[in-house]
UniProtKB/Swiss-Prot annotation:
Pfam families: ECF_trnsprt. It comes from Mycoplasma genitalium (strain ATCC 33530 / DSM 19775 / NCTC 10195 / G37) (Mycoplasmoides genitalium). GO terms for molecular function: transmembrane transporter activity. It comes from the Bacteria. InterPro entries: ECF_trnsprt_substrate-spec (IPR024529). This is Uncharacterized protein MG313.
Length: 287
């Protein structure tokens, strides 16, 4: 829960410096985000939140994410919605959980067990997430409410085409992930580096699937329903969840390699810096 205990965030200058740097990075990254739709943007905002959760654990990570989102809302003045507000804390919380598992497993004699267990978990997570999304809000009652309250627009988009593209995108996303894991399994000879790479990839995949694709899609639909006084958008009525899901899948499939490429070296820098600081702290305390 607290990876660098006995160091304490509020009593350690080094940890406070890291926290301040990461907080500043969240605001810098938020400036350079690119809007794809009114409820979807491309950014690397998850990286500083992932680093914070990795360094300080899930509890402090969740608090940091909540405070950062609150400050961002107060300074920018956009419409606050609780599902969107959960995303940043969840980035940091997931990072803290994955870091805890990594710490438990990094001294294991064989990382092949981790590889196959994580493979199983990823496959299960993909299947469950996709199933939940495809079943979400597809009942006739919801669509009847939408049809009654909206004049449906003729956007000339075939739902079957959306379904096929979404399915293909998920398959590509999954194959890219599996291919990268397979590369790590075959090429990485150093056990600790292999484990760090595997868990870094797992963290980025979990962030993409849990927060961006699963929660993000549901949040987008619920947000539009919220600002329309409980009425679903006409796009959802016409095309279902695919209209909101497909762009997210495509964006995450394209950005996943970049997320891993950014996160992995930064984790190495953080680990080395804080390990040295913890060693100096321990030696000074003993002396």
């Amino acid at each position: 829960m607290f990876p660098y205990y006995p160091l304490r965030l509020l009593k350690s200058l080094q940890l406070l410096v890291w926290a301040s740097v990461l907080l500043a990075l969240t605001f810098i990254f938020s400036i350079f985000s690119i809007s794809v739709t009114n409820v979807l943007s491309i950014s690397f905002l998850r990286i500083p939140f992932a680093l914070f959760g990795w360094i300080f654990g899930p509890i402090w990570g969740f608090i940091f994410g909540f405070l950062s989102d609150t400050i961002d809302w107060l300074t920018k003045g956009y419409v606050w919605f609780w599902m969107f507000a959960l995303q940043k804390p969840l980035f940091a919380f997931l990072a803290g959980i994955v870091k805890g598992i990594y710490l438990v497993r990094k001294n294991a004699s064989n990382y092949k067990v981790d590889f196959w267990v994580l493979q199983t978990l990823l496959v299960t997570f993909f299947v469950v997430s996709v199933t939940l999304l495809l079943l979400y809000l597809t009942n006739n009652e919801f669509q009847q409410i939408g049809t009654k309250n909206f004049q449906t627009a003729d956007l000339s988009v075939n739902v079957v085409v959306l379904q096929i593209i979404t399915l293909v995108s998920f398959v590509i996303f999954f194959l890219v992930t599996e291919g990268f894991l397979g590369f790590v399994y075959v090429k990485k000879r150093n056990k600790e580096q292999a484990l760090l790479t595997i868990y870094s990839l797992v963290l980025m995949v979990l962030m993409s699937v849990v927060v961006s694709i699963l929660l993000g899609t549901i949040a987008a639909i619920e947000f539009i329903t919220f600002i329309n006084n409980g009425r679903p958008s006409n796009n959802f009525v016409l095309y279902g969840v695919y209209f909101f899901l497909l762009p997210r899948v495509l964006v995450q499939a394209l950005l996943l390699p970049i997320y891993v490429a950014l996160f992995y070296p930064l984790i190495g820098i953080v680990e080395n810096n804080l390990k040295n600081y913890l060693l100096l702290f321990t030696l000074s305390w003993k002396s």
